[in-house]
Regions:
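Alpha-helical hydrophobic/aromatic positions enriched in membrane-embedded helices and signal peptides
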Residues: 2-4, 44, 127, 160
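Short beta-strand-to-loop acidic/aromatic patch adjacent to the donor-nucleotide binding site
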Residues: 3-14
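Short, Asp-centered acidic motifs that coordinate Mg2+ and/or phosphate
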Residues: 5, 74-76, 182
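Active-site-proximal beta-strand/loop segments in catalytic clefts of secreted hydrolases
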Residues: 9-11, 79-82, 187
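Surface-exposed, flexible loop/turn segments at secondary-structure boundaries
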Residues: 14, 82-85, 190, 196-198
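Conserved catalytic core of nucleotide-sugar-dependent glycosyltransferases
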Residues: 16-154
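C-terminal catalytic/acceptor-binding lobe
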Residues: 143-198
């Protein structure tokens, strides 16, 4: 099935179309797109090219062509949502072994209070799959082995600490290992329907 992007949405996510377009805008940042004018020769009523005073064909602007630099696209782009406690978000950063152990085996999640103050997209090590856009080429990358969402054992350097991570965490680990950045835009918050919409 040919596609440009896949949008992964959990069934408990609350959003409007503006949030979708914001996600697409983040995946294609301004610096990834250049615009070139398209000109055509001016023709008379007989269909012949009209020449200017300098003897060269007259031209007119007929459109604009946008060119995407695929190296500047963001292959994995996410918004965020609050989890059930209303304070923790769906994006996180990995911790070093000692910090992971002292944090009770939990990643360093962005908190609602902190992420709300951010103004620009930033990279994360993990995103929940409730609201994430994935570019064609990520799943197809040779280092992204199927099944893409298989739980796996995350082992820290010393071997003394291990964590059985879930399917979305394992996908993020594999994506980063394959060289993909995971981006989050703090301005793209979607609702998360639990006992209430948070």
């Amino acid at each position: 099935l040919p596609y440009d992007y896949q949008l992964w949405i959990d069934s408990d996510i609350v959003f409007n179309t503006e949030k979708f377009w914001q996600l697409l805008d983040m995946a294609l940042p301004e610096e990834a797109v250049t615009t070139e004018p398209i000109y055509e020769d001016v023709k008379d009523e007989k269909g012949e090219v009209v020449l200017g005073d300098d003897g060269k064909p007259k031209t007119k602007l007929t459109g604009l062509k946008q060119i995407v630099d695929t190296e500047k696209e963001r292959p994995i782009s996410a918004g965020w949502y609050a989890t059930e406690d209303g304070r923790t978000t769906s994006v996180a950063h990995w911790l070093e072994e000692d910090d992971f152990r002292s944090n009770g085996g939990v990643m360093n999640h962005e908190m609602v209070e902190g992420i709300s103050k951010r103004k620009k997209p930033f990279t994360v090590d993990y995103t929940g799959f409730g609201w994430v856009l994935i570019k064609n080429g990520v799943f197809e990358h040779p280092e992204m082995k199927y099944p893409w969402f298989a739980p796996k054992m995350q082992e820290f350097e010393s071997g003394a600490v291990q964590d059985m991570c879930g399917e979305d965490v394992s996908f993020c680990l594999d994506a980063i290992e394959a060289g993909f950045d995971i981006w989050c835009d703090p301005r793209i918050r979607v609702g998360h329907e639990k006992t209430r919409v948070i």
